[in-house]
């Protein structure tokens, strides 16, 4: 059954948030799972009586006292927690605390399904080389931009078979973030995370659609979307030697114009080891996923398999070619000089693709400690894939993989319990893209819960999702187009240039972090409050494909039947 999805439904979110959000009750503005944890934050230095009132009847359905008040240092706030987990009936409710403005909330069996569809559809809105028609894009329809059929080889990428200035084709793909360039390294974790969502929630995605041009074909919408980027990634490999170009870019960032108005020459820049390894890992996983869809995508699984192996071979011969930004290029670098985690991740994916033991041996030789995943720290991704296919491992290997994941998850669960806000975010998590840190921590907790089911893991996962959806010091849903209050001025060129008041929906803003590298005007330097909803703030209000991917994953996770969490 086709699930209708109208982008027009997202334009109603309020544009501005209160000057003093600390004085407000904080809830998950998208709602709570009927069988899940339900927490709200009450500011103040003492316990508070609270009650939940059913709407529209006005009946009081739950009363209790909040927890002991505690200081949450990242926000400089003393707060207590209202826990109404016992309330499980679906419906609209009002949370009431004397002295505070009441706040409405929703309890539902699937409160996040529509939000999920918007978060994944954000990738459609960021497609390069395609016109967005009103039938699919609504008011955000636009002409095609960047056909990328006349891309030049930059001097940094020149080779005997492709000298400087050679013209090549490299269409499709997703614009990386607020800019219009395309980067292999950042596409690595982004594309992998979406493929992993397919792997972990296959039944959900077989029946879920969100109105993209491919929705009527015989492929799941998720894989159609991912293929748009995989096809571009495939074109970024030099067929002569298997090396992979680091990025497709203009020399400098374009201005705040629509994609079809950004017409500066674009280039393929430098082959790097990091690009080759990200490419190898993603193409190996994609080959496994697409093997089921040979009729719809003939030859593609075999092509991606071959390309993954060739990229690995190139990286093995060139293990330390790091990205060096050319003097005439000023766009994103995605530089990384610690590649042991990329080697281990790619080795794990190639082992699962080929079944060849040397790849598995390479994984265990190169494996790094598990950390919260990011584009520069991908050690956990190989563990995730091996844990999913643990029957292929010896008992000793299986235990090593499992314990590497669960040990970190135990730390995150402890952070949740210790937090006054009941969110597993500590000061060092408030970095560029802090909201993606929250979502990637939640993914790790989900993976751990699949190994050993623990209520503490699920509670910490929910706490992290609550945080980005409104239960935070700014009383802000960080996803455009949703909640009572959400970002209106994201650092995203189409949203800035399209003359539409509302931003493109479904994008997760980067989030609070004290670096303030953009030199915009902020109201606070506190880690969890250092955020400004302004186009100028690329340090806190940009959107990127790698930040949205873990949000998509977690919204899919929380759209599963509760016993499967």
Where are these regions (language model features)?
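Bacterial N-terminal signal peptides
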Residues: 4-13
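Boundary at the C-terminal end of the N-terminal hydrophobic targeting segment
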Residues: 16-19
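N-terminal edge beta-strand
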Residues: 21-23
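Aromatic (Trp/Tyr) and acidic
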Residues: 26-99, 103, 109-111, 121, ...
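Surface-exposed, active-site-proximal loop segments in enzymatic domains
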Residues: 203-218, 260
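C-terminal transactivation domains of fungal Zn(2)-Cys(6)
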Residues: 208, 249, 282-334, 391-392
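HEAT/HEAT-like alpha-solenoid repeats
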Residues: 234, 313-316, 364, 368
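Proline-centered turn/helix-capping motifs that create local helix->coil transitions or kinks
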Residues: 237-246, 320-323, 355, 414-417
């Amino acid at each position: 059954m086709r699930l209708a999805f109208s982008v027009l439904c997202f334009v109603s979110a309020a544009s501005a948030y209160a000057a003093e959000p600390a004085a407000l009750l904080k809830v998950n503005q998208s709602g709570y799972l009927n069988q899940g944890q339900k927490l709200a934050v009450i500011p103040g230095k003492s316990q508070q009586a609270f009650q939940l009132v059913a709407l529209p009847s006005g009946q009081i359905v739950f009363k209790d006292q909040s927890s002991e008040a505690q200081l949450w240092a990242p926000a400089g706030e003393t707060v207590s927690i209202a826990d109404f987990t016992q309330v499980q009936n679906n419906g609209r409710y009002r949370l009431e605390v004397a002295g505070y403005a009441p706040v409405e909330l929703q309890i539902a069996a699937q409160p996040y399904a529509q939000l999920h569809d918007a978060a994944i559809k954000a990738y459609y809105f960021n497609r390069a080389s395609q016109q967005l028609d009103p039938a699919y894009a609504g008011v955000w329809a636009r002409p095609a931009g960047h056909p990328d059929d006349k891309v030049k080889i930059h001097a940094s990428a020149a080779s005997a078979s492709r000298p400087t200035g050679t013209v090549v084709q490299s269409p499709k793909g997703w614009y990386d973030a607020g800019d219009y360039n395309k980067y292999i390294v950042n596409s690595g974790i982004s594309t992998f995370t979406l493929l992993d969502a397919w792997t972990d929630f296959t039944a959900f995605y077989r029946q879920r659609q969100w109105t993209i041009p491919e929705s009527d074909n015989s492929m799941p919408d998720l894989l159609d979307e991912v293929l748009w980027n995989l096809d571009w990634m495939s074109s970024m490999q030099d067929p002569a030697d298997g090396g992979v170009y680091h990025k497709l870019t203009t020399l400098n960032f374009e201005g705040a114009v629509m994609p079809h108005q950004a017409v500066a020459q674009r280039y393929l820049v430098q082959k790097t080891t990091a690009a080759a390894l990200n490419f190898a890992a993603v193409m190996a996983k994609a080959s496994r996923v697409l093997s089921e869809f040979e009729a719809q995508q003939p030859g593609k699984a075999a092509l991606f398999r071959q390309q993954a192996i060739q990229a690995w071979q190139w990286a093995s011969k060139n293990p330390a070619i790091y990205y060096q930004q050319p003097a005439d290029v000023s766009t994103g670098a995605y530089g990384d000089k610690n590649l042991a985690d990329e080697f281990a991740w790619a080795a794990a994916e190639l082992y699962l693709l080929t079944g060849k033991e040397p790849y598995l041996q390479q994984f265990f030789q190169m494996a790094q400690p598990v950390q919260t995943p990011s584009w520069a720290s991908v050690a956990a991704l190989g563990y995730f894939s091996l844990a999913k296919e643990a029957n292929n491992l010896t008992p000793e290997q299986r235990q090593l993989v499992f314990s590497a994941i669960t040990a970190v998850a135990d730390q995150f669960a402890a952070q949740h319990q210790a937090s006054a806000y009941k969110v597993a975010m500590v000061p060092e998590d408030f970095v560029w893209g802090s909201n993606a840190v929250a979502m990637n921590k939640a993914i790790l907790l989900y993976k751990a819960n699949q190994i050993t089911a623990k209520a503490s893991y699920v509670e910490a996962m929910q706490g992290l999702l609550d945080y980005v959806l409104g239960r935070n010091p700014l009383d802000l849903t960080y996803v455009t187009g949703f909640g009572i209050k959400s970002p209106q001025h994201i650092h995203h060129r189409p949203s800035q240039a399209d003359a539409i008041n509302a931003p493109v929906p479904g994008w997760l803003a980067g989030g609070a972090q004290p670096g303030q590298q953009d030199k915009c005007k902020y109201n606070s330097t506190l880690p969890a409050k250092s955020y400004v909803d302004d186009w100028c703030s690329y340090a806190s209000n940009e959107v990127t494909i790698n930040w949205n991917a873990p949000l998509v994953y977690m919204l899919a996770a929380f759209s599963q039947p509760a016993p499967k969490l």
